[in-house]
From Swiss-Prot:
Keywords: Bacterial microcompartment, Iron, NAD, Oxidoreductase. Its EC number is 1.1.-.-. Induction: BMC production is induced by growth on 1,2-PD vitamin B12 medium. Its main location: other. It is found in: Bacterial microcompartment. Its cofactor is Fe cation. It comes from Salmonella typhimurium (strain LT2 / SGSC1412 / ATCC 700720). The lineage of its organism: Bacteria, Pseudomonadati, Pseudomonadota, Gammaproteobacteria, Enterobacterales. Disruption phenotype: Loss of NADH-dependent reduction of propionaldehyde in BMCs. BMCs appear to be normal, cells grow more slowly on 1,2-PD with limiting or saturating CN-B12. GO terms for cellular component: propanediol degradation polyhedral organelle. Pathway: Polyol metabolism; 1,2-propanediol degradation. It comes from the Bacteria. This is 1-propanol dehydrogenase PduQ. Transmembrane segments: none annotated.
Length: 370
């Protein structure tokens, strides 16, 4: 039996920050990173809130938020006792906000509303029951899943993402595509998640290159913002897979941007998963739905067409190879493979991969990357 639950009220479109005017005479705690704390975007957020609110800011969030940061946030939340918490930023800020609120609730600290406002189009964290917390000492990322992690509200205002640099736009956009593809072939996929994942994938293929090349186009940014949320809805229900299980290790060990790590793995993982008939047919079906091959094409031809389009998309987005992305870390890559293999096997996202992957398979995939 499959279940499908959307617990976040979504507000989208240009000017949707205006919904924040509903909060009056509240203590509002904004969680963001240090860059956003000194960015005009924070002023935009402040100006969207009525003047009678008390506003506090926690700006200690770093890429791949750490256990230490979450503990620090819980302590500050206990001291401040806010009524509204706003996770403002990319996936790291939203993940940290969700984790801080969740763990605080378990300690008896409750709030009225948790709001997620993305300033990148990638993680879909604004509508998911997931967050990822890192342990830098061990070089491991821990994905957490719990229905209590759903934000109460999400605001998708494309005006907040027009200033995102091309490389970040590319990386986060490829994260969206990975979410959609992994949800699409998941054993827990359903008609409901298929609709979300297919639409998200189509939007990425159509709009990501323009978002990278002409980032000031609000309409294009809005399409990618929507794609991110659609894919987030899909994987929150259907799960992820091997791509994320390995990407978490590339990020934890080498601090690669998460979306880039996913992009570098994507076609390799597709070839691996296509080794089982169900996944092969699913990939082929998506390729045909996207118009990448004739309807009468066999599965192999359709999968090759999908892979070709992904590689072309990566080229349009000017994504580096793994060797280039690793920089000086390349010399340590082979030595770290055993640790990455074990951590990937323990990663919760592996549970919904369409093809079982043992240690040898993951090792071979990692070796193939270089």
């Amino acid at each position: 039996m499959n279940t499908f639950s959307l617990q976040t009220r979504l507000y989208s479109g240009q000017g949707s920050l205006a919904v924040l005017k509903r909060f009056t005479n509240k203590h509002i705690w904004i969680i963001c990173d240090g860059f956003l704390a000194h960015s005009p975007l924070l002023d935009t957020l402040r100006n969207a809130l009525p003047a009678d609110n008390r506003i506090s800011v926690f700006s200690e969030i770093t890429p791949d938020p750490t256990i230490h940061t979450v503990v620090q946030g819980i302590a500050q939340m206990q001291a401040l006792q806010p009524q509204v918490v706003i996770g403002f930023g990319g996936g790291s800020a939203m993940d940290a906000a969700k984790a801080i609120v969740w763990f605080s609730q378990q300690s008896g600290i409750n709030i009225e509303t948790c709001v997620a406002i993305p300033t990148t189009s990638g993680t879909g964290s604004e509508v998911t029951s997931a967050c990822v917390i890192s342990d830098p000492d061990k070089g491991i990322k821990y994905p957490l899943f719990n229905n209590a992690l759903y934000p109460d509200m999400a605001i998708l205002d494309p005006e907040l993402v027009v200033s995102v640099p091309p490389q970040i736009t590319a990386n986060t956009g490829m994260d969206v595509l990975t979410h959609a593809l992994e949800a699409w072939v998941s054993p827990r996929a359903s008609d409901f998640t298929d609709a979300l994942a297919e639409k998200a994938a189509k939007l990425v293929f159509q709009y990501l290159p323009t978002a990278v090349e002409k980032g000031d186009c609000v309409a294009t940014r809005g399409k990618m913002h929507n794609a991110s949320t659609l894919a987030g809805m899909a994987f929150s229900q259907a799960g992820l897979g091997l791509n994320h299980a390995i990407a978490h290790q590339l990020g934890g060990q080498f601090h690669l941007p998460h979306g880039l790590a996913n992009a570098l793995l994507l076609t390799t993982v597709i070839r691996f998963n296509a080794g089982v008939p169900r996944a092969a047919k699913r990939y082929a079906r998506l390729a045909k739905a996207c118009g990448f091959c004739p309807a009468e094409a066999n599965d192999i031809a359709a999968i090759n067409a999908l892979i070709q389009q992904i590689e072309l998309l990566k080229q349009r987005c000017v994504l580096p190879s793994l060797a280039v992305a690793l920089k000086e870390g390349r010399s340590d890559f082979s030595a770290r493979i055993p640790a990455m293999v074990q951590a990937a096997l323990a990663d919760v996202t592996l549970r919904t991969n369409p093809r079982p992957a043992n240690a040898e398979a993951i090792r071979e995939l990692l070796e193939e990357l270089l």
